[in-house]
Amino acid sequence: EYYKTIVINFYNMVRKMDYANGGLGINEFFEDEGITTLGNYSEETCCSYNMLKLTDYMFRWNPDSSLIDYFENIFYNQIMCSMDPATGGKTYPISTAFGYYKIYSNAETAFCCCCCTGQESFSKLTYGEYYVTNDKSLTLMVNLFNPMTIKLNDQLTVKQTGDILLDGKSRITIVGNGKLTLNLRVPAWDKNPILKINGEKQTYQINNGYITIDREFSNGDYIDYEFNMSYRLDKQKGSENSYALFYGPFMLVCDLGNKDVDDIKDNQSDFGLPYD
């Protein structure tokens, strides 16, 4: 209990210093509470990787949907954007200042600790999506809304499909027959999602950030979960006029291309060069 208290206190302290996408630190240091300086050497990827692990432990202790709000943010907007889609190289920091670009690793001239945790991150893309308990009854907590199938037992399989980035919709289909409690997370970015069961719109109550569906399911039953993917601004901590723009859970960025940066793209010592 003593060490658990330390972990919770640490989490609550550093959350007061995170960037809009959940990343932490600049130059591998924490700043004063409530301050996040934008720069080229911010948000070390290893730090974000470990914050996901910490959040996972805390959620297992106390299943609170606000923990998954943070988990989702840092997963989509730091971890998922830390790999070069062309080469598989990983980022060390994620630059937060406008006009800076990412530098990716390679096996010959730029290889750091974040390459190793980065490999593990992309082997755990289902991490945090589902949590299963079977104390009093079989319960599946649906935390993230990415396509994924989970076999709960010999009688029941749950399949999630859809792409919320494209249309804000996710469908959960039941394969098999049996009793199941589904807890669907209500995300902070949409407190009023539309819920349909087998095509019929449902009313619901929200408890601890979740909608509970407790019933006997039949093979082929499906649940449609529809979100309002609206735009919103997130003010930078410690700044009066800097904001991040979000669309649903996704932080938006500007694609500035890579003109005139190819010559240093594999040199991780050149974090300080802005795109011009």
Model-derived features: positions:
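Glycan-recognition and catalytic cores of secretory/periplasmic carbohydrate-active enzymes
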Residues: 1-276
